[in-house]
C-alpha cells in the first residue's frame, strides 16, 4: 500500500507504461516464428525457387533506421533499430524472429515470401542514389518490379502475398509526416493496396529531383527486402611485408633519410600549419602505425562492434617500425626437419568471374613426422579395433575358381566328362580339363583426407576433436588393412594460398604397421582449412591408381576457410567446384563431418547423398568404419 512512497519506483513504472513499448511495428510474441526453427525448410524453399545452392541463410542484425520517429520514440530511444531482410551475393539475411502479425501462419508466410522474393531479386541492379528521396523512390520501383517477377514465376505465392499486403496495411502505423514524406508514404500504401487487390484512389504524384533539407526516409516495409552491395576485395598482402628496422645494419645518413621522406607518399601532405581541431589528435594517435599493448578486452570490443551498423576494416600502409631485431635461437627439437617431397600449384575457382585463377595455390607435400610411441587406446577402443578388423575381414576378396584350364591343381570333372563324350561320339576331345584358383584382385583404391586445422584443437564433450579423429583414423586404417583395400592417408591444413601443407601418413604402396600408427599419433593441429586445393592435390595421385573404383573420403570438422579472401561463398564455391573436378576424374567423393551445423552448407558442396554428419563426436570411431563399409560395398 505504501509503494507510492517509493518515488523512484513509482516514476519508473509510470515512465515504462508511457514509453516502454515504442517500436514502430506492433509485436505479438505469442505468435512469433523463430528463424532457427525453420531455417532448413527455408533453405529447401530457396533452392526450389531456383536460388543458388551455395547461398547461405543467416539472421539479420538490427540496424539503425533513419525514418521519422514520433515524440514518444524520440524520448525513449532517439533512434530505432530494425532487423530488416537483406541479401548479398553470398547470404540471405532474414529477421531472427517475426512476430509482426497476430497470426502465426502469417508470420511463417512472411518468411516464405521473403525467400521467394530474394530468389528472383536482381543482383546486378545499380546502386541506389545518395539522395534520400531518390533512394526511396528507386527502392520502391525495384520492389514493384521484383514483386511482379516473383508472382509471375511462382503463381502459388500470389495469394500469400495478397494476404500479407492486407495484414501489413492493417499493422502499418499512422504517423505525422512532412508533406513530401506523406506523398512517399501514400506511394507505399498504393503499392500495398495493389498487392492486396484493394481499391486505390490515390492520385499520381510528381516528385522533385532532390529531397529538401530535413527529409527523412520512409519506414521500411518488411515485405520488400533490400540488396546489399559488397565490393570485391583483393587478397591482402600487407602481412607479408618485411618489418622495417629503425636501427638496421648500415645506418642511413641524414641525406638518405630526407630523400626517402620526400619520396614517401605518407609524408607528402605534411604541413607546418595546424588547421585541424585538436580533438582529432587523440583519434589520429590511435591510427599511428606503432606496436602498442591492447587496453580493452576482446569481449568489450565485440559488444561495441555489434552496436555499429557498419564496421569498416582498414590496412596499415606498411608494418610498424621495429626498434630492434633479433633471431630466436630455437632448440634442436623445435626445428621442423621434415623434408618437402614436392611443391605444386593448383588453380582456384573464382565464382564472381566465372573462371579459374591459374596457379593460385601452392601445395607443400611432405611426410608426417613419426612419434616415438603409438597412440594409446583404452580397453574400449582396443576392443573396437578388434571388432572392426573382424568385420572388415569379411570384405576381403576370396579366391575365384577358373574352370576348363590347360593346367591346374585339380581336375574339372565336368570338362573331363564333356571331353570323353566328345571322343566317344567320334569328335575331338579337349585338353582344358583342369581347375585353377587364384585370389580375387582388390578393385578399390581409397584416399583418406583428414582436416587437421586449428579448430580440431577444440574440446567437445570433454574430448579433443583431433584425439577422436586419431582414434577413428586408427580404427578405420586397421579395418582397411584387414580387408586388403589399397589405401593412402593424407592430412591438410593451410595458411594463405601460398602455404597449403598436405602431409602423407600412409602411401598406397606402404603397408599398415607400427610406423603408420606412430605417424597417426604424431598428428597435431595446424591453421586453416583450404579444402579445394587439398582435394585437388589428393585426387591427382588417386586418379592415377589402376583400380577400377576410387574413393576420396574427407574427414573434417568445419566449413572451408582461410585467413585471406578464402571464406564465405568464395570458399564454398571453390570447394564445390573441386568436388565436381574429383567426380569428373572418375573418383567418388564423400565427406564425413562432426560439425553440427554442417547440414547448412555440406549439401551445397557434396550433394544430398555425398556426406554424413556424426553429431556425437564420441561415436566417430564407430561410425567411420560403418560409413566406409557402406561406400565400399
Curated annotation (Swiss-Prot):
Gene3D superfamilies: von Willebrand factor, type A domain
Keyword flag Iron: no
Biological role: Part of the operon norEFCBQD encoding nitric oxide reductase. Essential virulence factor, probably involved in the detoxification of nitric oxide (NO) produced in the macrophages during the innate response against infection.
Xref: InterPro entries: NorD/CobT, VWF_A, vWFA_dom_sf
Name this polypeptide is given: Protein NorD
Renumbered residue ranges of the record's region Disordered: 232-270, 290-313
Keyword Protease: no
Pfam families noted in UniProt: VWA
Domain VWFA: 445-631
Alphabetical keyword list: Virulence
Biased composition range(s): Basic and acidic residues: 232-243, 258-270, 292-306
Amino acid at each position: 500500500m505504501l509503494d507510492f512512497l517509493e518515488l523512484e519506483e513509482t516514476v519508473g513504472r509510470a515512465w515504462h507504461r508511457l514509453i516502454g513499448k515504442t517500436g514502430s511495428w506492433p509485436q505479438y510474441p505469442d505468435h512469433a516464428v523463430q528463424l532457427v526453427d525453420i531455417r532448413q525448410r527455408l533453405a529447401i524453399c530457396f533452392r526450389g525457387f531456383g536460388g543458388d545452392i551455395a547461398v547461405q541463410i543467416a539472421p539479420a542484425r538490427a540496424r539503425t533506421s533513419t525514418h521519422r520517429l514520433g515524440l514518444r520514440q524520440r524520448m525513449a530511444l532517439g533512434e530505432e533499430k530494425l532487423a530488416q531482410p537483406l541479401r548479398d551475393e553470398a547470404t540471405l539475411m532474414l529477421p531472427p524472429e517475426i512476430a509482426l502479425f497476430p497470426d502465426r501462419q502469417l508470420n511463417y508466410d512472411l518468411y516464405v515470401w521473403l525467400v521467394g522474393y530474394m530468389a528472383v531479386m536482381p543482383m546486378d541492379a545499380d546502386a541506389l542514389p545518395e539522395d534520400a528521396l531518390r533512394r526511396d523512390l528507386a527502392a520502391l520501383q525495384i520492389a514493384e518490379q521484383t514483386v511482379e517477377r516473383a508472382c509471375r514465376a511462382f503463381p502459388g505465392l500470389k495469394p500469400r502475398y495478397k494476404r500479407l499486403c492486407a495484414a501489413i496495411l492493417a499493422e502499418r502505423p499512422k504517423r505525422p509526416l512532412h508533406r513530401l514524406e506523406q506523398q512517399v508514404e501514400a506511394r507505399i500504401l498504393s503499392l500495398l493496396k495493389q498487392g492486396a487487390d484493394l481499391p486505390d484512389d490515390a492520385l499520381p504524384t510528381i516528385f522533385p529531383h532532390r529531397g529538401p533539407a530535413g527529409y527523412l526516409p520512409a519506414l521500411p516495409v518488411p515485405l520488400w527486402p533490400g540488396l546489399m552491395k559488397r565490393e570485391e576485395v583483393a587478397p591482402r598482402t600487407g602481412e607479408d611485408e618485411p618489418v622495417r628496422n629503425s636501427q638496421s645494419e648500415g645506418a642511413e645518413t641524414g641525406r638518405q633519410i630526407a630523400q626517402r621522406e620526400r619520396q614517401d607518399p605518407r609524408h607528402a601532405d605534411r604541413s607546418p600549419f595546424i588547421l585541424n581541431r585538436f580533438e582529432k589528435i587523440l583519434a589520429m594517435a590511435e591510427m599511428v602505425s606503432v606496436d602498442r599493448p591492447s587496453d580493452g578486452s576482446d569481449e568489450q570490443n565485440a559488444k561495441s562492434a555489434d552496436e555499429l551498423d557498419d564496421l569498416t576494416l582498414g590496412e596499415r600502409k606498411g608494418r610498424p617500425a621495429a626498434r630492434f631485431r633479433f633471431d630466436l635461437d630455437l632448440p634442436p627439437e623445435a626445428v621442423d626437419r621434415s623434408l618437402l617431397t614436392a611443391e605444386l600449384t593448383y588453380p582456384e575457382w573464382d565464382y564472381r568471374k566465372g573462371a579459374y585463377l591459374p596457379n593460385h595455390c601452392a601445395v607443400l607435400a611432405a611426410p608426417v613426422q613419426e612419434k616415438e610411441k603409438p597412440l594409446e587406446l583404452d580397453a574400449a577402443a582396443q576392443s573396437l579395433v578388434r571388432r572392426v578388423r573382424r568385420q572388415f575381414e569379411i570384405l576381403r576378396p576370396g579366391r575365384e575358381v577358373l574352370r576348363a584350364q590347360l593346367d591346374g591343381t585339380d581336375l574339372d570333372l565336368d570338362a573331363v566328362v564333356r571331353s570323353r563324350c566328345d571322343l566317344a561320339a567320334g569328335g575331338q576331345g579337349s585338353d582344358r580339363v583342369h581347375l585353377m584358383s587364384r585370389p580375387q584382385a582388390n578393385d578399390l583404391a581409397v584416399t583418406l583426407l583428414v582436416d587437421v586445422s586449428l579448430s580440431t584443437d577444440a574440446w567437445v564433450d570433454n574430448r579433443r576433436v583431433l584425439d577422436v579423429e586419431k582414434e577413428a583414423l586408427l580404427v578405420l586404417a586397421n579395418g582397411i588393412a584387414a580387408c586388403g583395400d589399397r589405401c593412402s592417408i593424407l592430412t591438410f591444413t593451410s595458411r594463405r594460398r601460398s602455404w597449403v601443407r598436405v602431409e602423407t601418413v600412409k602411401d598406397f604402396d606402404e603397408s599398415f604397421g607400427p610406423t603408420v600408427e606412430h605417424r597417426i599419433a604424431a598428428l597435431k593441429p595446424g591453421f586453416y582449412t583450404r579444402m579445394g586445393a587439398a582435394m585437388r592435390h589428393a585426387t591427382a595421385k588417386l586418379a592415377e591408381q589402376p583400380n577400377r573404383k576410387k574413393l576420396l573420403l574427407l574427414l573434417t570438422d568445419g566449413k572451408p576457410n582461410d585467413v585471406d579472401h578464402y571464406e564465405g561463398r568464395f570458399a564454398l564455391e571453390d570447394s564445390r567446384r573441386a568436388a565436381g573436378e574429383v567426380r569428373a576424374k572418375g573418383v567418388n567423393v564423400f565427406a564425413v563431418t562432426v560439425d553440427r551445423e554442417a547440414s547448412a552448407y555440406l549439401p551445397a558442396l557434396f550433394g544430398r547423398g555425398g556426406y554424413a554428419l556424426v553429431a556425437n563426436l564420441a561415436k566417430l570411431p564407430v561410425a567411420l568404419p560403418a560409413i566406409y563399409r557402406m561406400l565400399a560395398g
